[in-house]
């Protein structure tokens, strides 16, 4: 009688499902390359994330975060001549295994991991290098919902053509375009230079800014413009300052010519309420001690 190389393949599906639930990510990835049946069974397990993060750095890597594990990393060892790739799976403890499938490229591995761990194929890209078109060729069949641009050489406006499903965008070094600002993103995080006009024309729901010194007068103009109807989709506007890099916000300057009510006053934060003529209200909060942030949240 011939020996079965992988006895687990002979188990009935209901027994196999129970066994799979007792296993971890490493075991699942090892088993998923043995047969299509096991691959599909693992993909239906509950608890895996709906989205995973794919980082393009000097070496290609992929990070998965979900309920069944806090953090799981992958690296690709690429054969430059054939473009075949081995997958190294890392755990939080720093241990890893290497998986090899003949003919598998980086694209094949990404699609495989996405199917097994994230069935809807929604991904987050972190771009450290300017080769965005090369990245697109690898992930074009997936639904890219979030992109973080670390490279200063990527034109942010190019992203909208490549990734029409984009909802979350982080721009850390690249210049930001008016096309991006006026696009209906759910969340825009900016660490590059922005102006008052950039803020006023933005059409995102959640706008987060770091590393910019937005003055009290500019914030006053922004709030007065919001009261008059600007930024209609805005739900949250957030500025994070480095500690003690500027003078404290002045209440008299911030709310000049604005009707407002102070709702809370603490050592580390103060909260005020402003409103539009139609009754829409917003909470304005900042840190009076360290001056580390300014936050405006529209009430719904």
Swiss-Prot record:
<dbReference type="Pfam" id="PF00646">
    <property type="entry name" value="F-box"/>
</dbReference>
<dbReference type="InterPro" id="IPR012885">
    <property type="entry name" value="F-box-assoc_dom_typ2"/>
</dbReference>
<dbReference type="Pfam" id="PF07735">
    <property type="entry name" value="FBA_2"/>
</dbReference>
<dbReference type="InterPro" id="IPR001810">
    <property type="entry name" value="F-box_dom"/>
</dbReference>
<dbReference type="InterPro" id="IPR053222">
    <property type="entry name" value="Zygotic_Embryogenesis-Asso"/>
</dbReference>
<protein>
    <recommendedName>
        <fullName>F-box associated domain-containing protein sdz-33</fullName>
    </recommendedName>
</protein>
<feature type="domain" description="F-box">
    <location>
        <begin position="5"/>
        <end position="51"/>
    </location>
</feature>
<comment type="function">
    <text>Substrate recognition component of E3 ubiquitin-protein ligase complex which mediates the ubiquitination and subsequent proteasomal degradation of target proteins such as mdl-1. Positively regulates axon regeneration by targeting mdl-1 for ubiquitin-mediated degradation; probably thereby reducing levels of mdl-1-mxl-1 heterodimers, allowing free mxl-1 to form complexes with tdpt-1 and thus inhibiting tdpt-1-dependent sumoylation of ets-4.</text>
</comment>
């Amino acid at each position: 009688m011939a020996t079965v190389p992988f006895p687990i393949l002979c188990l009935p599906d209901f027994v196999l499902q129970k066994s799979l639930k007792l296993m971890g990510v490493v075991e699942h990835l090892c088993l998923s390359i043995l047969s299509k049946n096991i691959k599909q069974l693992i993909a239906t397990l509950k608890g895996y994330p709906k989205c995973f993060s794919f980082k393009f750095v000097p070496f290609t890597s992929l990070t998965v975060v979900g309920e069944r594990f806090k953090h799981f990393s992958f690296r690709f060892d690429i054969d430059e001549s054939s473009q075949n790739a081995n997958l190294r799976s890392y755990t939080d403890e720093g241990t890893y295994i290497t998986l090899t499938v003949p003919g598998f490229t980086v694209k094949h591995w990404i699609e495989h991991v996405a199917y097994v761990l994230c069935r809807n194929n929604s991904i987050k890209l972190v771009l450290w290098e300017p080769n965005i078109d090369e990245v697109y060729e690898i992930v074009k069949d997936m639904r890219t919902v979030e992109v973080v641009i670390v490279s200063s050489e990527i034109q942010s406006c190019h992203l909208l053509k490549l990734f029409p499903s984009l909802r979350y965008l982080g721009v850390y070094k690249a210049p930001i375009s008016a096309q991006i600002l006026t696009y209906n993103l759910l969340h825009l995080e900016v660490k590059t230079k922005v102006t008052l006009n950039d803020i006023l024309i933005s059409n995102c729901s959640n706008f987060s800014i770091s590393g910019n010194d937005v003055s009290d007068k500019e914030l006053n103009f922004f709030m007065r413009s919001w009261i008059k109807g600007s930024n209609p989709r805005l739900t949250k506007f957030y500025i994070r300052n480095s500690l003690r890099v500027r003078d404290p916000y002045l209440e008299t300057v911030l709310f000049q010519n604005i009707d407002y009510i102070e709702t809370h006053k603490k050592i580390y934060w103060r909260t005020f309420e402003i409103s539009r003529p139609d009754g829409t209200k917003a909470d304005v909060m900042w840190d009076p001690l360290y001056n580390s942030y300014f936050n405006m949240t529209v009430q719904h």
